Design a protein with these regions (language model features):
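Glycine-/charge-enriched secondary-structure boundary and capping motifs
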Residues: 1-20, 63, 95-123, 128-136, ...
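Extreme N-terminal cap/leader segments of soluble proteins
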Residues: 1-66, 82, 91, 113
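Short coil/turn connectors at secondary-structure junctions
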Residues: 25, 31-32, 41-44, 84-88, ...
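Glycine-rich anion-binding loops of enzyme active sites
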Residues: 39-41, 45, 52, 87-180, ...
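Glycine/charged-rich beta-loop-alpha catalytic/anionic-binding loops adjacent to active sites
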Residues: 52-61, 144, 190-196
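Small-aliphatic-rich amphipathic alpha-helix that forms the alpha element of a beta-alpha
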Residues: 64-88, 109-117, 208, 212, ...
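Helix-rich terminal scaffold detector
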Residues: 187-190, 202, 250, 259-261
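Polyanion-binding loop/helix "lid" in catalytic or ligand-binding cores
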Residues: 189-235
Length: 333
């Protein structure tokens, strides 16, 4: 590794200043090459990793505090979907050549706030200089009772398809970032625009649903790459999702956008970055699941059923017209 620039701290000083204060038990203040973590008796560890890259998953001009919250939040969303509670995380940070201490201080502060809110301390990682855009890779470690992890592929024909929160806000927020003068989105009131932009910047992992998913869900995943595409990932093997478009929950801001331009409904149904929980529950269990989720502060909607058959999810409009959405799940390649 090359020497630090005169106006920047070296790697050891950088870690001590910005990341050691975030370290949890077992990390030894980030002074060692590894950390230790022991699950509680009768529990399994659940591990997940996601990377975000400047110019791909976030805008380089985004506030560093928001970038940090997103990097941790998208990983904790995966833990929630598996029914796990967060225990800790590892961080690998690739800094772009033009990084500044001000950016790093904001990033560290955002991580500290998010980690404290979610009860998820830092255990270790790596900090390097990237040859290109900045990247952040987080490995999140969660815990759940042994043998209780909720798989993606457990749905059965007849199960009810459920989703938490609202769908499409983040995709519409991204559309607003990419084309702020776009006809329909530009006509939204500032409050509605702010809601959509915030949902894109700040995913909210639905950790409160984790214990309920273990009890009720036959399958679960988070909606990261778009509702339509993620439904396709969850099905297969003789199962096909049959979705009632009118039952897909949209926020008031998203409804205003769709009312201004009906084509934006497809953006909402296929766009990514929702980080809501998509799950299936056995018939007859949906009412109890929704009631307990509401008591935990998370609204859940029943949007369809698992049918027999193959193919992409079938969306039925209020007029009774069934259709497949052309856009599928987001793919990097």
């Amino acid at each position: 590794m090359s020497a630090a620039a005169p106006d920047r701290p070296g790697e050891d000083a950088l870690i001590a200043r910005y990341f050691a204060p975030l370290a949890g038990e077992g990390a030894d203040g980030l002074r060692d090459d590894a950390a230790s973590l022991t699950p509680r008796p009768g529990h399994d560890l659940v591990l997940t990793a996601d990377a975000i890259v400047a110019g791909v998953h976030y805008f380089p001009e985004d506030p560093p505090e928001s970038v940090a919250r997103k990097a941790l939040g998208v990983n904790l969303s995966d833990l929630a979907a598996k029914g796990a509670a967060p225990r800790a995380y590892l961080l690998s940070l690739g800094l772009a050549p033009d990084w500044t201490e001000a950016w790093l201080a904001g990033f560290s502060a955002g991580l500290a706030e998010a980690a404290s809110a979610f009860g998820c301390p830092l255990l270790g990682g790596d900090t390097v200089r990237a040859a290109g855009p900045a990247f952040i890779n987080v490995t999140a470690l969660g815990e759940l009772p042994s043998g209780s992890m909720v798989r993606r592929q457990g749905a059965r024909v007849g199960d009810r398809v459920c989703v938490s929160g609202t769908i499409g806000d983040a995709a519409l927020g991204l559309a607003l970032r990419l084309a702020p003068a776009g006809a329909a989105l530009a006509r939204l009131e500032p409050e509605a625009r702010a809601v959509l932009l915030d949902r894109y910047l700040h995913p909210r992992p639905r950790l409160a649903l984790a214990p309920l998913l273990r009890r009720y869900a036959s399958a679960a995943m988070d909606v990261s790459d778009g509702l339509a595409g993620d439904l396709a990932k969850m099905m297969g093997g003789g199962r096909r999702a049959e979705i009632r478009e009118a039952d897909v929950p949209l926020s008031p801001a998203a409804r205003l956008a769709v009312a201004a331009d009906p084509a934006l409904l497809d953006t909402a149904l296929t766009g990514g970055d929702d980080y809501e929980i998509l799950c299936t529950v056995p018939p007859g269990a949906e009412a109890a699941f929704r009631a307990e989720a509401a008591a935990a502060g998370v609204p859940v909607a029943v949007i369809g059923v698992v049918g027999a058959g193959e193919g992409p999810p079938l969306f039925t409009t209020e007029e009774g017209v069934s259709r497949n959405l052309r856009a599928g799940s987001f793919s990097h390649f």
